[in-house]
Amino acid sequence: MEQLFKELTFSNGVKAKNKFLLAPLTNMQSPDQGRISDDEFIWLTKRAEGGFGIIMTCAMPVLKSGIGWKGQLGIYDPKHEDGHYRLNERLHNLEALSIAQIFHAGIRADINYSGDKIGPSINSEKSAREMSIAEIEEMKLAFVECAIRAQQCNYDGIELHAAHG
């Protein structure tokens, strides 16, 4: 058990103060078009105050069309950046690493935001259509842009969530 409390060093040299990681939990606390709310900010920072060495965000869509739930934290728009800077400043002051989980809801997207559901192939059960080559290229670019945005907002790492094809 004591191993959990020991420092964790990643292959790139980055160190976490312990091996406790907050898993990505979507709790729909950021209803203002993806901007981090005070509730979500407090919820995440309280975990760092409680001793977690690594805090991972909820799944954040890389495109507005990738929103899966109302109140989902976003990273797809520059207007989201201020909240991410503020969050990371606080997490780092609490000696916690921060990881941004980025995704697209795909066949589970909320059609109120996306207009339709897309996937790598037709999914009649989820009423999803097959993505075009152009949409695949747009998606790849969106993941790259959001990974760069996360890095610029001082996240220590990125996790790619790709379960909703």
Regions found by a protein language model. Give the residues of each.
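N-terminal capping/small domains of soluble enzymes
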Residues: M1-F103, M139
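Active-site groove signature of glycoside hydrolases
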Residues: Q151-G165
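Short glycine-enriched loops at secondary-structure junctions
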Residues: C58-P61, F103-R108, H161-G165
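Non-globular sequence segments
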Residues: L97, F103-Y155
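A generic "cationic amphipathic patch" detector
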Residues: R35, G68, I111-Y113, A163
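Generic hydrophobic/aromatic pocket-lining and core-packing "Φ" positions
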Residues: L44, N88, A147, Y155-I158
